[in-house]
């Protein structure tokens, strides 16, 4: 599915938006998180938090390019989790 259509699904508040995002970019998000965290469970949690972050952010914005916007959310979440783990 095209990114514009996925963004449209987020604007419509359709749960299909998350499924389409996961289908198209889920592996990319996991790789971003796992390269930082090196822990499958924490990486999966970051990916799920990315979907929540997108769900909350998109009605206010129409990001372009979508993959970079979403990937940055994943990166920020993974870095935050890494800092938290390192501080403990």
Describe the function of each predicted region.
Residues 11-20, 30-49:
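Short, charged helix-capping/linker segments at alpha-helix termini
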Residues 75-88:
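Arg/Lys-rich amphipathic alpha helix in sigma70-family domain 2
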Residues 1-8:
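Intrinsic, short, N-terminal disordered tails of RNA polymerase sigma-factor systems
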Residues 11-12, 48-66, 84-86:
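Sigma70-family region 2
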Residues 21, 25, 29, 50, ...:
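Residue-level preference for hydrophobic side chains embedded in well-ordered alpha helices
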